[in-house]
């Protein structure tokens, strides 16, 4: 790597599962720069707004917190309308000169809907209530899809799937943060 090139930040796996009257978002705690783990217990999943929305992020931490703050502002403008708030955030994210340079992805959920938001303006609802982002996202997604029809509850599926991702992805660890909402 040339000295003029910044190190690439790697890390995280965020997964959401909606099943059995619950929606769960979980994520690992590892943050790496280059080949070095610089933090193992980062909290990348949290409650938003008045606690009726949960979210997780993959990407640059400062960028993600900026986007969480913007989403909370949109949720205040459009209370109880996560999809509308997410679409409005995505519009801003894509068109605002400052925001469009932010490098992060977000998974957010309320009692009715789960969404992934990207800097390219995408607001996507997962198939079968399962979606993942981040470096270990494909591994966690595959594991969760394999487990979704089992008798396991949503939180168990999230925990097991993130453990499987941690077995495979060097940028994912087992220091998990899990948030749950009732969908009833």
From Swiss-Prot:
Compartments in which it is found: Cytoplasm
Main location as per UniProt: cytoplasm
PROSITE patterns cross-referenced by the UniProt entry: PROTEASOME_BETA_2
GO biological process: proteolysis involved in protein catabolic process
Domain of life: Bacteria
EC numbers for this chain: 3.4.25.2
Record: active site: 12
Regulation: Allosterically activated by HslU binding.
Keyword check for Cytoplasm: yes
Keyword terms, alphabetized: Allosteric enzyme, Cytoplasm, Hydrolase, Metal-binding, Protease, Sodium, Threonine protease
Cited Pfam families: Proteasome
GO cellular component terms attached to this protein's record: HslUV protease complex; proteasome core complex
Residues that bind Na(+): 166, 169, 172
GO-annotated molecular function: metal ion binding; threonine-type endopeptidase activity
Reaction catalyzed: ATP-dependent cleavage of peptide bonds with broad specificity
HAMAP family reported for this sequence: HslV
Subunit structure, interactors included: A double ring-shaped homohexamer of HslV is capped on each side by a ring-shaped HslU homohexamer. The assembly of the HslU/HslV complex is dependent on binding of ATP.
Function description: Protease subunit of a proteasome-like degradation complex believed to be a general protein degrading machinery.
Similarity-based family: Belongs to the peptidase T1B family. HslV subfamily.
Protein name: ATP-dependent protease subunit HslV
Source organism: Nitrobacter hamburgensis (strain DSM 10229 / NCIMB 13809 / X14)
Lineage: Bacteria, Pseudomonadati, Pseudomonadota, Alphaproteobacteria, Hyphomicrobiales
Encoding gene (name): hslV
């Amino acid at each position: 790597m040339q000295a003029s090139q910044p190190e690439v930040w790697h890390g995280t796996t965020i997964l959401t599962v909606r099943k059995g009257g619950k929606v769960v978002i979980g994520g690992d705690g590892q943050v790496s720069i280059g080949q070095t783990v610089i933090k193992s217990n980062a909290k990348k999943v949290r409650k938003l707004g008045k606690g009726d929305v949960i979210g997780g992020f993959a990407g640059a931490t400062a960028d993600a917190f900026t986007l969480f703050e913007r989403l909370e502002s949109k949720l205040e403008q459009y209370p109880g309308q996560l999809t509308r708030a997410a679409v409005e955030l995505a519009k801003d994210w894509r068109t605002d000169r400052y925001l469009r340079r932010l490098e992060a992805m977000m998974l957010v959920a309320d009692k009715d809907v789960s969404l992934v938001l990207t800097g390219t303006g995408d607001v996507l609802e997962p198939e079968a209530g399962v979606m993942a982002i981040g470096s270990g996202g494909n591994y966690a997604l595959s594991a969760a899809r394999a487990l979704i029809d089992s008798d396991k509850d949503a939180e168990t599926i999230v925990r097991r799937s993130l453990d499987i991702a941690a077995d495979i992805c060097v940028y994912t660890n087992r220091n998990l943060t899990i948030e749950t909402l009732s969908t009833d």
